[in-house]
Amino acid sequence: IPPWTDSSLDKQTKRIHDQVPLTRKCIVNQCLFWCDVAQRFKRSLHSKRVAVAPQDSDGNNNQNAQSSSESNFIVGVIGCGSVGSKFVRELVKRDIVKPNQIKISSRTPSRAKQRCGLEVIQSNVEIASHCTILFIFVLPFHFRNFSREIRDAIQGSRPLVVSSLAGFTQMYLQ
């Protein structure tokens, strides 16, 4: 008899299996929260840009400034596993950004492309240096190497960085 058919292991496996729907709900809720963060940040940027937009001869804000701020809003997502890919799909589904305004990278590009329906950029540095807001959905044990890789790009482009890493303080992330 194989050891994995032991009744105690079966109970443990069943308990873990029973938690899967709850875990999926938590992932969806986390993604909805991050979508809300992205949308609020986009609105605040948009309102600041419109407030300082040049006015035409009638005193109206220039519409080109409005569309320019929309097209310049780029969301970078590094890490497109369960949470990252769900987040990207929700961003598009809720029309927070257009698909061409999202740049993604992943350790598994083919899976990320399949899950998100977007082209995957191989360079985390490229994403970090060209986005307005950067969402980080990497596993904690990858963070040290990953952070060294993008440190200079973030300091140069100054995106808003949002991390879903558990167990890391803001001070450590900086």
Mark where each language-model region is.
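Rossmann-like NAD(P)(H) cofactor-binding subdomain of soluble oxidoreductases
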Residues: 110-112, 124-136, 140-174
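NAD(P)+-binding Rossmann beta1-loop-alpha1 motif at the extreme N-terminus of oxidoreductases
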Residues: 1-114, 119-122, 126
